[in-house]
UniProtKB/Swiss-Prot annotation:
It comes from Salmonella phage P22 (Bacteriophage P22). The lineage of its organism: Viruses, Duplodnaviria, Heunggongvirae, Uroviricota, Caudoviricetes. This is Eac protein.
């Protein structure tokens, strides 16, 4: 993201109230993981992908991930192939031009629909913390690395890896109202991209050496 760094402003916020906010997500996270794990187990999947929305909530179950070689109950179409924890995995659907494939897809869709109905009230971590502070903003960055169009930006943040009472955020710095008007909370401290990068990439087991 360094090529897009100038299109963001960077902040940190710390304190006891931040610690409480971080801890308050534990229950939500546990519930999300339970729902997603249960859904995956029903179809023999070992993982899943969730939907992403530009400046939106996202976080809903989008597809299941199976270990390559999994014996599906029907002919399938592989939508994507990748690696996960050193294993080759696939995202697949039943072949839509077969009766068995269509029936299998209905089964997958029903399980995803049921899971998503529960997930709607359980936001992903990034949305949870950005929504808490009212700092979600979108923006248009520089040219895409692929050379086609421009990068779509939105606020993102996370926990300081070495602290339980500190969050860091990157907020698009465009001023166009159509991308969202936000008021930076008084408790937020502006930091440089270098400081943000160092914090975001710090290892959890290292002692913090810089303010």
């Amino acid at each position: 993201m360094s090529g897009q760094s100038k299109y963001y402003d960077y902040y940190m916020v710390e304190g006891e109230d931040v610690k409480e906010l971080i801890q308050s997500y534990d229950t939500i996270n546990d519930q999300r993981n339970s729902i997603l794990t249960t859904a995956a187990e029903k179809v023999g999947a070992i993982a899943w992908t969730t939907a992403r929305s530009w400046g939106g909530e996202g976080g809903l179950l989008q597809s299941f991930v199976w270990e390559k070689g999994y014996e599906f109950p029907c002919q399938i179409t592989i939508k994507r192939e990748d690696f996960l924890d050193g294993k080759r995995v696939v995202i697949a659907r039943g072949k839509g031009n077969t009766k068995e494939g269509r029936a299998y897809n209905k089964e997958l869709d029903a399980i995803m629909h049921n899971a998503n109905a529960k997930l709607k009230s359980l936001p992903e971590w990034n949305y949870y913390i950005t929504n808490h502070y009212g700092i979600m903003r979108t923006g248009i960055g520089g040219q895409s690395g692929r050379g086609f169009g421009f990068v779509m930006l939105s606020t993102y943040g996370g926990k300081h890896p070495q602290r339980d009472d500190c969050l860091i955020f990157a907020i698009p710095n465009n001023k166009e109202e159509r991308h969202g008007v936000v008021v930076i909370p008084d408790a937020f401290k502006k930091i440089t991209y270098g400081q943000f990068y160092d914090i975001a990439n710090a290892k959890e087991d290292e002692e913090e050496t810089a303010e």
